[in-house]
From Swiss-Prot:
Name assigned to this protein: Adenylosuccinate synthetase
Active site: D13, H41
Binding site for Mg(2+): D13, G40
Entry keyword GTP-binding: yes
Recorded name of the encoding gene: purA
Residues given in the record as substrate binding sites: V300, T301, T302, G303, R304, A305, R306
Pfam family, one: Adenylsucc_synt
Keyword tags: Cytoplasm, GTP-binding, Ligase, Magnesium, Metal-binding, Nucleotide-binding, Purine biosynthesis
Function (record text): Plays an important role in the de novo pathway of purine nucleotide biosynthesis. Catalyzes the first committed step in the biosynthesis of AMP from IMP.
NCBIfam families the UniProt entry points to: PRK01117.1 (NF002223), purA (TIGR00184)
Organism, scientific name: Clostridium botulinum (strain Loch Maree / Type A3)
Summary of subunit composition and partner proteins: Homodimer.
Protein family according to the UniProt entry: Belongs to the adenylosuccinate synthetase family.
Binding-site positions, IMP: D13, E14, G15, K16, N38, A39, G40, H41, T130, R144, Q225, T240, R304
Biological process annotations from GO: 'de novo' AMP biosynthetic process; IMP metabolic process
Length: 428
């Protein structure tokens, strides 16, 4: 394997950061290909905990090249705050270890302002945005009015683009939403400062990444969010603004589809989601509360409590199909220890029919009634398990059901947040 993808197979928060960190040990390059600082990854190394939002998880190794791809929308302020945070924890970040695509689009102050204003204007029909300016930045990208990193570091180009764009944005902010206009000079001077700090990191990442692949280097593509937050295949409109599935790698990192050899879907042993939208297996009872507390299900970026539910195999089967997954990595199976009975969803009942896929219509998904298969749980903690045979028989049966239903093998099992609480049970 020379180029493989790690992506979320549910609604995000599956443990991609930990899995990327684990798999990055044998990689030469780690590439982030979409999203922005709305993502949150937690990685535990020894006694230290690192919270990452923009920078690839490979940064915690000294010998990896980390890449922020053109599919990412970059908030320079957030980037340098994260760099300062990591350096305060002893992580060295230099242009030899981190490069940023010259084609990545830049999140500007008006993107954050518009994100918040529009969300408030939706009232009780809000979509649960993080308010980081991600959606408005991707909107400008599609409308061909965005500012890219290569534009930002060219002073004259940036000056002209900012003048044109800010004039339009201020009209929208003031005349449509009744907000206060943003000051051109303030933004211009602030972002010129970012431009100079960014300049040493900026490269044509497609050229570099493809050369690494051609030279036989191990390249890991790190996704953010999850399959059901994908702009096309997610539970629209309660989705993110980028392509979170395997196909997003080609666009977001400038590589061809034939370069990808493997795709690993990260899945919790149960299901969670943040914000609004249908959730067929949601547990609105004491069991759901118990899972939330035991699994520490609160967002890294927002701090919001996550909604919790039984494992939904329909979602995993859909993710495997859409992204061509070669295997799953199952996380947080240790959280389920102590439950007498476990349920997994093996189908939906919709309008009198049984289906095994996620329907496009939000209204149809809201009507779907889960069909469950029950499994006996296990009492003992499995946090100290270090190989497959250490797992309880019932946990192995649970994992086998995932494989059989999705027709996709489970290659990795995680039983805790630390690096050594991870077992590779087959090739990915």
């Amino acid at each position: 394997m020379s180029a493989f993808i790690v992506l979320g197979a549910q609604w995000g928060d599956e443990g991609k950061g930990k899995m990327t960190d684990y798999l990055a040990e044998n990689a030469d390059v780690v590439v982030r290909f979409q999203g922005g600082n709305n993502a949150g990854h937690t990685v535990v190394v020894g006694e230290k905990e690192y919270k990452l939002h923009l920078i690839p998880s490979g940064i915690l190794y000294n010998d990896k090249l980390n890449v922020i791809g053109n599919g990412v929308v970059l908030d320079p302020k957030a980037l340098f705050e994260e760099i300062n945070y990591l350096e305060s924890l002893g992580v060295e970040i230099t242009p030899d270890r981190l490069i940023i695509s010259d084609r990545a689009h830049v999140i500007m102050p008006y993107h954050r302002i518009l994100d918040g204003i529009k969300e408030r204007a939706r009232g009780n029909k809000d979509i649960g945005t993080t308010g980081k300016g991600i959606g408005p930045s991707y909107t400008d990208k599609m409308e061909r009015s965005g500012i890219r990193v290569c534009d930002l570091i060219h002073k004259e180009v940036f000056e002209e683009n900012l003048k044109e764009t800010l004039e339009v944005k201020n009209k929208i902010i003031t005349e449509v939403f009744g907000g206060e206009a943003l000051d051109y000079n303030e933004i211009y001077n602030e972002y010129l400062g970012y431009a100079e700090k960014l300049r040493p990191f900026v490269k044509d990442i497609s050229v570099i990444v493809n050369k690494k692949i051609k030279d036989g280097k191990e390249v890991l593509f790190e996704g953010a969010q999850g399959t059901l937050l994908d702009i096309d295949y997610g539970t629209y409109p309660y989705v993110t603004s980028s392509s979170t599935i395997a196909g997003g790698v080609c666009i977001g990192a400038g590589v061809g589809p034939t370069a990808i050899t493997n795709a690993v879907g990260i899945a919790k042993a149960y299901t969670t989601r943040v914000g609004k939208g249908p959730f067929p297996t949601e547990l609105l009872d004491r069991t759901g509360d118990w899972v939330r507390e035991k699994g520490h299900e609160f967002g890294v970026t927002t701090g919001r409590a996550r909604r919790c539910g039984w494992l939904d195999l329909v979602i995993l089967k859909t993710s495997a199909r859409i992204s061509g997954l070669t295997s799953f990595a199952v996380t947080k199976i240790d959280t389920l220890a102590g439950l007498d009975t476990l349920k997994v969803c093996t189908g939906y009942r919709l309008n009198g029919e049984i289906i095994d896929y996620v329907p496009a219509s939000l209204e149809d998904l809201a009507k779907c009634k889960p069909i469950y298969e029950e499994f006996q749980g296990w009492d003992d903690s499995i946090a100290n398990a270090r190989c497959y045979k250490d797992l309880p028989e019932n946990a192995i049966k649970y994992l086998k059901k995932i494989e059989d239903f999705t027709e996709t093998k489970v290659s990795i099992v995680s039983v805790g947040p630390k690096r050594d609480q991870t077992m590779m049970i087959s090739e990915i």
